[in-house]
């Protein structure tokens, strides 16, 4: 499973820490946290981290289908990924990749690198609950977010945007929103929340990298990406939450928090800040 990282190191001559993180759909978030740790602990000046996935094939589709995790809107695939909608019925497999260069700040300045933002915190936890279902009250997700906020040295009130895992599954969306509200308290009504999986599908192991990039561009462009395809909000969801439904919203984003979770109860959170 480490051939992807090994190939990149050989192609570009990277001789620092080199391995693949394997934690289902949380993998690339965990990889970014590992890269962040390597730099701040003085083990590297520059790290490349990300993820890739090409899962539109018979084994992957068959496996997830047997778990009843996939949407069955086969006649309307463009609208099948619909986080927070009362008629959501599972996720849509996406394919893609994303990679980010993490670099010690003074090192980046010295070489004149273009700096988009800074990563300031990472958190990880386990649900210790079920192989495929999240904890119904989002306990593991709350721990991951709280640990990331503590690691970043900020307050919940500093968060402007949350890119949720939001896979469009009946079991997953609401516990995550409960967790976000539990962590942010009343400030949850001041933040934008969205699931970019509504547009990309679920990139599985690459989800964290792709969604980190969505957060970074929200910071650099001052535009929060939307949650599309939500036509009828699930009645169990607080209607006062700003889920950035169906249209991007302009706002200053100083701090963005990104969640990715994986089967097996793997939870991970990264936080980026404007610089």
Where are the model-predicted features located?
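Condensing-enzyme catalytic core mediating Claisen C-C bond formation in acyl metabolism
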Residues: 75-152, 161
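Flexible, low-complexity linker/loop segments at domain and module junctions
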Residues: 152-158, 189, 238-275
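Conserved small-residue
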Residues: 8, 28, 35, 64, ...
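Active-site-adjacent elements of ketosynthase-type condensing enzymes
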Residues: 54-81, 123-143, 167-180, 206, ...
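Short beta-strand-to-turn element immediately C-terminal to the catalytic PLP-Schiff-base lysine
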Residues: 10, 100-104, 150, 181, ...
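Conserved beta-ketoacyl condensing-enzyme motif
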Residues: 1-24, 52-61, 156-172
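Conserved catalytic cysteine-centered active-site region
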Residues: 1-34, 43, 66-92, 180-209
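Beta-strand segments within the central parallel beta-sheet cores of soluble alpha/beta enzyme folds
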Residues: 18-23, 44-52, 114-122, 157-164, ...
């Amino acid at each position: 499973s480490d051939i992807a990282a090994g190939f990149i190191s050989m192609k570009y001559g990277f001789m620092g820490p080199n391995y693949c993180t394997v934690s289902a759909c949380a993998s690339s978030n965990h990889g970014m946290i590992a890269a962040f740790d390597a730099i701040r602990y003085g083990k590297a000046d520059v790290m490349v981290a990300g993820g890739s996935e090409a899962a539109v094939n018979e084994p992957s589709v068959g496996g997830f289908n047997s778990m009843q995790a996939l949407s069955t809107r086969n006649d309307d695939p463009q609208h099948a990924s619909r986080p927070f909608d009362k008629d959501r019925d599972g996720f849509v497999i996406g394919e893609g990749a994303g990679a980010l260069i993490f670099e010690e700040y003074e090192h980046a300045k010295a070489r004149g690198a273009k700096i988009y933002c800074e990563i300031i915190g990472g958190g990880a936890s386990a649900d210790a609950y079920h192989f495929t279902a999240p904890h119904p009250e989002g306990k593991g997700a709350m721990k991951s977010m709280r640990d990331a906020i503590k690691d970043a040295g900020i307050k919940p009130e500093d968060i402007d945007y949350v890119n949720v895992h939001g896979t469009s599954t009946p079991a997953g969306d609401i516990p995550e929103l409960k967790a976000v509200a539990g962590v942010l308290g009343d400030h949850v009504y001041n933040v934008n929340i969205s699931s970019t999986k509504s547009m990309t599908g679920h990139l599985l192991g690459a989800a964290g990298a792709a969604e980190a990039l969505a957060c970074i561009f929200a910071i650099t462009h001052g535009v929060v990406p939307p949650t599309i395809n939500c036509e009828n909000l699930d009645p169990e969801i607080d209607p006062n939450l700003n889920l950035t439904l169906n249209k991007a919203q302009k706002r200053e984003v100083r701090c963005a928090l990104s969640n990715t979770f994986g089967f097996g109860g793997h939870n991970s959170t990264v936080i980026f800040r404007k610089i």
